[in-house]
């Protein structure tokens, strides 16, 4: 039987500033004592997307307030915390630096150990926090900047078996929202618009379904939507609300079809591990899309697997997942020192080759 451990965690890799306090009991159960998330939607709304410089300044201004709020909500203090955890990458470098510097300051001032956590590991391990999913499990990590299939065999054992070779679905949703003059963030806007639309009105491609493997591509789908939109604007002088809804529905249906087929293929590879309880997990901000969730649940059932999707609040960026990832690692990994660096790019599976088209500056994750 171990001892009780309490972790204060920080997350600031994109446009959500977050802090959380988690406690792992002597018998291994973990409680989220508090989880504070402060979004920046109003700061970026006028620009049609996240502006890194604005995001970084906002993180720097509010991180300490989030920490105070998280400690107060957890009814604890820095003195009672056993460790500090922080997202050290990947992400927008200004925001990651803000979080890392704040965490270093807290660690230095309190003498507490510091743990730099991969943001994607936080997402990938969340099903163990919410549902105590046993290893190994299959994870579809689908977020604003990332999309990959991972075989997860341990807290630090991730094997990528496929992913997007260009735009991640979250990026594609944001770009489609801009094309259709829908508000940002694009994911929820496109999903809302799609509910009123006819997905069959326009013929849109399902990229890479004619090729083997689990890799995906969404840039061609985005281009197809652009061409349809431009044709409508040329023919009728603009877009009507029904045009927006039908294009949203068609785009979303295409994304769902691609994710479903590629997930079925990934399930076949995963089943070769002969897991005791086959489990398909989905995490990341795009996993909040209910059309995607519903279809993936069907894929899991058709493949004889349990489907696990964390609550929506733990799918989008949060610090609770960072704290849990730290708790998972603390038993077998030493803490980081104060030379911990912020990393804009940090592949979870460093042994796999970089994805083709994974980014102009290298592999995102």
Curated annotation (Swiss-Prot):
Please give the InterPro entries that the UniProt record associates with this protein. Answer: ATPase_NBD, Gcp-like_dom, KAE1/TsaD, TsaD
Annotated positions binding Fe cation: 119, 123, 317
Family label: Belongs to the KAE1 / TsaD family.
- Positions of substrate binding: 141-145, 174, 187, 289
Return the EC number: 2.3.1.234
- CDD domains given in the database record: ASKHA_NBD_TsaD_bac (cd24133)
Protein name (Swiss-Prot/TrEMBL)? tRNA N6-adenosine threonylcarbamoyltransferase
Which reaction is the catalytic activity of this chain?
L-threonylcarbamoyladenylate + adenosine(37) in tRNA = N(6)-L-threonylcarbamoyladenosine(37) in tRNA + AMP + H(+)
- Cofactors required: Fe(2+)
- What's an example of a GO molecular-function annotation for this chain? N(6)-L-threonylcarbamoyladenine synthase activity
Q: Which residues form the signal peptide?
A: none
Query: What does the record note about the cofactor?
Result: Binds 1 Fe(2+) ion per subunit.
What keywords sit in the KW lines? Acyltransferase, Cytoplasm, Iron, Metal-binding, Transferase, tRNA processing
**Top-level taxon:** Bacteria
- List, alphabetically, the GO terms of the cellular component aspect: cytoplasm
Q: Which GO terms describe its biological process?
A: tRNA threonylcarbamoyladenosine modification
Job of this protein? Required for the formation of a threonylcarbamoyl group on adenosine at position 37 (t(6)A37) in tRNAs that read codons beginning with adenine. Is involved in the transfer of the threonylcarbamoyl moiety of threonylcarbamoyl-AMP (TC-AMP) to the N6 group of A37, together with TsaE and TsaB. TsaD likely plays a direct catalytic role in this reaction.
Give compartment(s): Cytoplasm
Question: Which organism encodes this protein?
Answer: Roseobacter denitrificans (strain ATCC 33942 / OCh 114)
Q: Where is this region: Disordered?
A: 342-365
């Amino acid at each position: 039987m171990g001892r009780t451990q309490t972790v204060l965690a920080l997350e600031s890799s994109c446009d959500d500033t977050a802090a959380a306090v988690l406690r792992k009991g002597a018998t291994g159960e973990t409680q989220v004592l508090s989880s504070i998330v402060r979004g920046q939607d109003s700061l970026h709304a006028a620009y049609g997307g996240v502006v890194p410089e604005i995001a970084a300044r906002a993180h720097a201004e509010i991180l300490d307030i989030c920490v105070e709020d998280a400690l107060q909500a957890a009814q604890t203090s820095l003195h009672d915390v056993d460790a500090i955890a922080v997202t050290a990458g990947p992400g927008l470098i200004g925001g990651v630096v803000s979080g890392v510097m704040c965490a270093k300051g807290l660690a230095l001032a309190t003498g507490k150990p510091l743990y730099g956590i991969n943001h994607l590991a936080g997402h990938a391990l969340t099903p163990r926090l919410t549902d105590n999913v046993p290893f190994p499990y299959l994870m579809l990590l689908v977020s604003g900047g990332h999309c990959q299939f991972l075989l997860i065999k341990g807290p630090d054992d991730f094997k990528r078996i496929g992913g997007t070779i260009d735009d991640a679905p979250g990026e594609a949703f944001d770009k489609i929202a801009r094309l259709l003059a829908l508000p940002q963030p694009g994911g929820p806007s496109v999903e809302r618009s799609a509910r009123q639309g006819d997905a069959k009105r326009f013929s849109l491609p399902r990229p890479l379904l004619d090729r083997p493997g689990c890799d995906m591509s969404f840039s061609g789908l985005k281009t197809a939507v652009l061409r349809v939109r431009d044709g409508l604007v040329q023919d009728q002088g603009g877009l009507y609300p029904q045009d927006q809804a039908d294009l949203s529905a068609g785009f979303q249906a295409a994304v769902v079809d691609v994710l479903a087929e590629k997930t079925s293929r990934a399930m076949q590879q995963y089943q070769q591990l002969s897991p005791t309880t086959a489990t398909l997990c989905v995490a990341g901000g795009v996993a909040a899309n209910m059309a995607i969730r519903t279809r993936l649940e069907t894929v899991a059932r058709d493949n004889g697997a349990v489907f696990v999707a964390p609550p929506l609040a733990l799918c989008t960026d949060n610090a609770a997942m960072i704290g849990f990832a730290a708790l998972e690692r603390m038993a077998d990994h030493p803490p980081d020192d104060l030379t911990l660096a912020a990393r804009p790019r940090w592949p979870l599976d460093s042994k796999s080759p970089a994805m083709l088209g994974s980014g102009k500056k290298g592999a995102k994750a």
